């Protein structure tokens, strides 16, 4: 299937599925123009840019009993946030911010208001099952991302379309154009895999990962992704792991280092960033040496590697929950009868990373709709606190301002500040004391539009 045909088919599927699901699930508001991107890094599709929906007209004033300052990692009391259109126009103490007489006031004086959460590693598409149409696959993806939005994740980085070609690009664009509700997305398209055994899926499905065999076609694969509109280049320097009889873990390495270096160099030449799926071993080492911008998973990351990542300015995205239970326990039980377990190794690595000064540790769930259901990603914050020893405030920073910075969106999201998008969430308690408050979301606003308000009667919230 040609790239053009693939894009046309994906766009048709997204359009049909989006129209159907939006009609069924949401009553939308009429819309208008968008705003240009002013940040660094991959070009996002913030919108709407001529789409159908927009936030309510006039000024919105949010009274916050407690407001989380994600820059400083602390709570501020009795704050007011003024919003016009999609943007925040003023933030400050209630005694200092004058609320216009005609403003619509949202009273969250008994709640904690935070920036919208950012999930740095999602898969909106499930792997397609035999006989599943692209339209059905797209419907499921839209349902997934809307569950994420209602759970408070107003932005996300989608790390490959799970054998659905570049349909994630079309969904990202549909969201930015206001045609469907969903988080602000950066996407990675098909992903690039090493030819040979790891490319068998592509032989069965031409929309699966794009296989490469040498440095030249590696560079061409990066260019194809950029031409199709991918924001990130998803690479797979490492594959599965297995325990030897001695208890030592062995990891599959895929691309030779020169090919991996060509992939990353071409990505950077085109002003994009690379995300590398590695579980450990030589592939993990190569990803760091080659300068992969974000290292995903890395079960046995060690201090020497973490220190090198700090020097190179790389970020670590463990996807803690997704790769522990049930994945690791199931894998290790089948392979060793539970004699050897990866979970303690992974927990040690994440705790070490969290304690490494200067290392940017991201909050990315790895949610895939199969082993980890969409809408449940707030569990990732809890595990960082309870298993990796992060303070709740630092975990909140990882899932907001740090993720925004790594994604190049630091001027637009990740903090409640003047000029940024009005992406806000609210919970009843104090998540800096009890991080599980994020699992009981009450209010979600994206770009000044109220997505969820569980404080209201169901009939009122639906209007």
Where are these regions (language model features)?
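Histidine/acidic-residue-rich catalytic or RNA/ligand-binding cores of hydrolases
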Residues: 128-131, 168-169, 244-246, 284-290, ...
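Histidine/acidic residue-rich metal-binding segments in metalloenzymes
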Residues: 170, 216-236, 242-316, 342-361
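His/Asp/Glu-enriched, well-ordered alpha-helical/loop segment
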Residues: 269-271, 344-431
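Active-site mouth loops of central-metabolism enzymes
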Residues: 127-139, 201-220, 273-275
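Metal-associated gating/positioning segment near the N- to mid-region
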Residues: 108-177, 195-196, 202-203, 258, ...
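Divalent metal-dependent hydrolysis catalytic cores, especially in the metallo-beta-lactamase
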Residues: 142-167, 182-190, 230-241, 273, ...
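Histidine-rich, glycine-flanked metal-binding segment
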Residues: 42-58, 67, 72-114
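C-terminal cap of metal-dependent C-N hydrolases
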Residues: 65, 399-401, 418-461
């Amino acid at each position: 299937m040609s790239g053009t045909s693939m894009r046309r088919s994906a766009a048709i599927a997204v359009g049909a599925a989006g129209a159907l699901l939006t009609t069924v699930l949401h009553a939308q508001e009429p819309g208008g123009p968008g705003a240009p991107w002013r940040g660094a890094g991959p070009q996002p599709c913030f919108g709407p840019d001529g789409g159908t929906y927009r936030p309510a007209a006039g000024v919105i004033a949010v009274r916050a009993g407690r407001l989380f300052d994600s820059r400083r990692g602390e709570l501020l009391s009795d704050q007011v946030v003024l919003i016009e259109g999609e943007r925040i126009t003023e933030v400050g103490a209630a005694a200092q911010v004058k609320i216009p007489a005609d403003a619509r006031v949202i009273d969250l004086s008994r709640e904690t208001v935070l920036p919208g959460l950012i999930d740095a590693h999602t898969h909106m598409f499930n792997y397609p099952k035999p006989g599943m149409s692209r339209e059905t696959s797209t419907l499921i993806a839209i349902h997934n991302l809307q569950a994420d939005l209602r759970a408070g994740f107003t932005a996300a980085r989608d790390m490959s379309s799970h054998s659905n070609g570049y349909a994630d690009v079309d969904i990202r664009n549909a969201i930015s154009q206001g045609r469907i509700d969903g988080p602000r997305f950066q996407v990675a398209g098909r992903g690039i895999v090493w030819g040979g055994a790891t490319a068998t899926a592509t032989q069965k499905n031409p929309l699966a990962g794009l296989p490469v065999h040498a440095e030249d076609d590696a560079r061409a694969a990066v260019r194809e992704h950029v031409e199709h509109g991918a924001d990130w280049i998803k690479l797979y320097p490492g594959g599965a792991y297995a325990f030897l009889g001695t208890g030592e873990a062995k990891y599959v390495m895929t691309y030779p280092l020169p090919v991996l270096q060509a992939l990353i160099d071409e990505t950077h030449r085109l002003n994009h960033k690379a995300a590398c799926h590695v579980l450990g071993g030589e592939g993990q080492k190569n990803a760091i040496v080659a300068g992969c911008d974000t290292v995903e998973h890395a079960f046995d990351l060690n201090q020497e590697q973490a220190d090198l990542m700090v020097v190179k300015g790389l970020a670590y995205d463990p996807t803690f929950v997704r790769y522990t239970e049930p994945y690791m326990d199931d894998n290790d039980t089948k392979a060793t009868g539970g004699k050897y377990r990866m979970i303690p190794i992974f927990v040690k690595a994440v705790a070490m990373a969290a304690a490494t000064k200067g290392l940017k540790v991201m909050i990315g769930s790895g949610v895939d709709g199969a082993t980890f259901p969409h809408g449940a990603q707030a569990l990732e914050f809890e595990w960082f606190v309870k298993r990796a020893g992060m303070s709740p405030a630092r975990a909140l920073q990882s899932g907001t301002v740090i993720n925004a910075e790594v994604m190049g969106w630091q001027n637009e999201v990740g903090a409640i500040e003047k000029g940024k998008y009005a992406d806000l969430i609210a919970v009843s308690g104090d998540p800096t004391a009890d991080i599980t408050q994020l699992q009981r979301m009450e209010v979600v606003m994206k770009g000044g539009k109220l997505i969820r308000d569980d404080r209201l009667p169901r009939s009122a919230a639906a209007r």
